């Protein structure tokens, strides 16, 4: 009888690390694997992962980048504690392979996995690698990246995205059947993007009513009241939502998406095959959102506007200058740069590297 293989996923902090990890976890679990997740009790993974019936191990570690003198002074002690906790988790789980998907907790756990001789596979979601993955890449058995040439000796797999996005109809099949005003989807994420919430309503108001697009604007629960007030003040009609349950349908219905440029957003836009105007978050570490967006914008597959250059007048002129055939071509180019088999490929590498 074949022994059941065990995957230990290390990921935490943000959805950009957790959601692709969940995609791979589900893929391997469907193949009969046992999956255990290592995270931080204070991260979103602590509440999200158990909803997927995945057991968790926890370590306590706040990161390698100093947040003040006290944090820097305590870093050696915090690292030592995290190494010890990681050692305990690895001995309890006895994984066949360890998959690091990013976040601070991957550093101590990944180092201990390597020290114990457990196969270590890394996946970097951003176009500029995080500090933990830069260090771990030197000891990992395999390094996978969402964007080309992010880390040395890595394989470009793309980002694992929601299964339904990878199997959407081709852009031509969607754009060619539409008539009337453009459909614009504005995505601010779970926290909302204040810059988009302020500028987009004003920009739409500057357009003649006959040229105004149909707008769906998602802003996060904390920003939704302010957003609705902004549209009311601008006397613009829009569907405003705190969150969107079915992102695949939202992408499928859109001619243009206006959004930030987090790694998963860029990957989802490409997988869906939809035109996008990216406004990178200006305070992202190493300005990685700009580099993420450039992966598509430099190929003519998206538009890129820096937040400091985002004005209502400029955005209004940009929207007025767009038409559906132009957007269809951008969507087609974006789809051509997607890696729809990313989940399958990452799972395949884990299977190849597994050792009982």
Curated annotation (Swiss-Prot):
Keywords: Cell cycle, Cell division, Cell inner membrane, Cell membrane, Cell shape, Cell wall biogenesis/degradation, Glycosyltransferase, Membrane, Peptidoglycan synthesis, Transferase
Primary localization class, coarse: membrane
Catalytic activity: di-trans,octa-cis-undecaprenyl diphospho-N-acetyl-alpha-D-muramoyl-L-alanyl-D-glutamyl-meso-2,6-diaminopimeloyl-D-alanyl-D-alanine + UDP-N-acetyl-alpha-D-glucosamine = di-trans,octa-cis-undecaprenyl diphospho-[N-acetyl-alpha-D-glucosaminyl-(1->4)]-N-acetyl-alpha-D-muramoyl-L-alanyl-D-glutamyl-meso-2,6-diaminopimeloyl-D-alanyl-D-alanine + UDP + H(+)
Keyword hit for Cell inner membrane: yes
Gene3D superfamilies in the cross-refs: Glycogen Phosphorylase B
Group of enzyme by EC: transferase
Enzyme Commission code(s) on record: 2.4.1.227
GO MF term (any one): UDP-N-acetyl-D-glucosamine:N-acetylmuramoyl-L-alanyl-D-glutamyl-meso-2,6-diaminopimelyl-D-alanyl-D-alanine-diphosphoundecaprenol 4-beta-N-acetylglucosaminlytransferase activity
Localisation: Cell inner membrane
Pathway: Cell wall biogenesis; peptidoglycan biosynthesis
Cysteines paired by S-S bonds: none
Protein name: UDP-N-acetylglucosamine--N-acetylmuramyl-(pentapeptide) pyrophosphoryl-undecaprenol N-acetylglucosamine transferase
Source species: Cupriavidus pinatubonensis (strain JMP 134 / LMG 1197)
